[in-house]
Amino acid sequence: MSTRRRTLLKVIILGDSGVGKTSLMNQYVNNKFSQQYKATIGADFVTKELQIDDRLVTLQIWDTAGQERFQSLGVAFYRGADCCVLVYDVNHLKSFESLDNWHNEFLTRASPRDPMAFPFILLGNKVDIDGGNSRVVSEKKAREWCAEKGNIVYFETSAKEDYNVDDSFLCITKLALANERDQDIYFQPDTGSVPEQRGGCAC
């Protein structure tokens, strides 16, 4: 019986403090949500094992503190990432306006071989608050931002209600796997092919 290949994927989650990055991770990995807010200091990661088709995947999800003083965590933290997840709070305009900075921060620090093809995904979190009546960033506005950045995949989520959490992380895993395959192709000798630009997620 052949041994199935196990793949380690590194995913980095970026966004302002308080947008729910840690809550999304905990809901996905531990099926838990806490009402108490505790700021992440520096960086931390959790792992989750899953199977995609015939691949055994270990998803290593890195959570960063969103405070400005922790924004530059160092090149080593970003390098080797297979996917970058950007998170904002649909009820907090500043967290949406900060997305450009986080997007640029990642590209500058991680220096992906093909920035236009590198997989990003955007999560608009906390859609459950006040039944959606408190939101200040529309889905249309978020999707327009994604289109400007090369058709980034977008999900609206609620860590508290476990809304779209599993679906979004499954998509993240598939995007990361696709990026890993593109990197394998890139390093093959005598190839003139360029990794295809992302357009969506076959979730």
Curated annotation (Swiss-Prot):
Chain positions recorded as GTP binding sites: 15-22, 63-67, 125-128, 158-159
Pfam families membership: Ras
Subcellular location, principal: membrane
Lipid attachment points (S-geranylgeranyl cysteine): 201, 203
Any one GO BP annotation for this protein: positive regulation of autophagy
Subunit and interaction comment: Interacts with VPS39.
Name recorded for this polypeptide: Ras-related protein RABG3b
Species in which this protein is naturally found: Arabidopsis thaliana
Gene this chain is encoded by: RABG3B
